[in-house]
C-alpha cells in the first residue's frame, strides 16, 4: 500500500471491473486518487483498439518512493484481504445470480437484497424482495436501515458500484456480497442474463 502513489491518479482494473471496484474503495480510504476502469480488462480495455498497442507481457515495477498510510487504515485493508482469501462461500465477495436464485428458492430468511440503482429503475422492475438504496453521494447516511443480522446481497447495474459498496459495508462490519454482473441484460451477464425475472 505504501508503494502506491498519493500524488497522482491510480487506475485500477481486473477482469470485469468488480474486484477492482472493491480495491478502489479501499484505496480511497487510504487517501489515494483511484479510479476503476469500467468493464475491466475483458469488457473494457481489450476492446479498445488503441489499448492493444500499449499491451505488454512484461511486469511493471513500483518506484522507490514510499507514501505514508495511516496505520489503522493499513490494518483494515490487510484484514479485508485476509477475509477475502479466507472466504469459503463466495469467491472475492461475489455471489453469482444462480447462487442467489437458489437461496431465494430455498426461502432463505438470512439474506437481504439491496438494489443500488435509481428509484426510477427500481420501480420499473427489481429482484423480488429487494430494498432500494440508490448509489450516490450521502448514501452512507442510510446504511442504518440495513440489517446487521443478515447477509447483504448488493446489486447495481453491472456489479461495479455494488462492489465498491460491498467493500464499504464490509469495512464497517457487515457481511456483504456483490451480485456478479449486477442486473445485467437479457442475453448478457448478471441477473437478467441468467434468465431470471423481476417484479414491480
How should each PLM-predicted stretch be described?
Residues 12-14, 155-156:
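Short, surface-exposed ligand- or partner-binding patches at beta-edge/loop junctions that are enriched
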Residues 120:
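Conserved alpha-helical interface elements of two-component signaling phosphotransfer modules
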Residues 101-109:
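A short acidic-Thr-Gly-centered motif at the start of a beta-strand
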Residues 115, 156, 180:
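Active-site proximal loops enriched in glycine and acidic residues that flank catalytic Cys/His/Asp
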Residues 1-9, 18-94, 98, 123-151, ...:
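Rhodanese-like catalytic fold shared by cysteine-dependent sulfurtransferases
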Residues 16, 114, 158:
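Single, functionally critical "micro-switch" positions that shape active/binding sites
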Residues 100, 112-117, 133:
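Short hydrophobic beta-strand that contains or immediately precedes a catalytic carboxylate
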Amino acid at each position: 500500500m505504501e508503494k502506491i502513489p498519493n500524488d497522482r491518479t491510480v487506475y485500477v482494473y481486473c477482469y470485469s471491473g468488480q474486484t477492482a471496484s472493491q480495491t478502489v474503495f479501499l484505496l480511497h480510504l487510504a487517501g489515494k486518487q483511484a479510479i476503476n476502469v469500467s468493464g475491466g480488462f475483458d469488457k473494457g480495455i481489450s476492446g479498445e483498439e488503441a489499448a492493444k498497442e500499449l499491451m505488454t507481457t512484461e511486469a511493471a515495477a513500483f518506484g522507490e518512493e514510499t507514501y505514508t498510510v495511516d496505520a489503522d487504515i493499513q490494518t483494515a485493508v490487510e484484514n479485508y484481504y485476509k477475509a477475502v482469501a479466507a472466504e469459503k462461500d463466495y469467491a472475492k465477495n461475489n455471489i453469482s445470480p444462480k447462487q442467489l436464485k437458489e437461496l431465494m428458492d430455498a426461502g432463505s430468511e438470512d439474506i437481504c437484497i439491496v438494489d443500488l440503482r435509481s428509484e426510477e429503475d427500481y420501480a420499473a422492475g427489481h429482484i423480488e424482495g429487494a430494498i432500494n438504496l440508490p448509489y450516490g453521494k450521502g448514501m452512507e447516511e442510510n446504511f442504518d436501515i440495513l440489517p446487521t443480522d443478515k447477509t447483504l446481497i448488493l446489486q447495481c447495474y453491472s456489479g461495479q458500484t455494488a462492489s465498491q459498496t460491498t467493500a464499504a459495508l464490509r469495512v464497517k462490519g457487515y457481511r456483504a456480497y456483490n451480485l456478479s454482473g449486477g442486473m445485467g441484460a437479457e442475453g448478457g451477464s448478471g441477473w437478467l442474463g441468467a434468465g431470471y425475472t423481476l417484479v414491480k
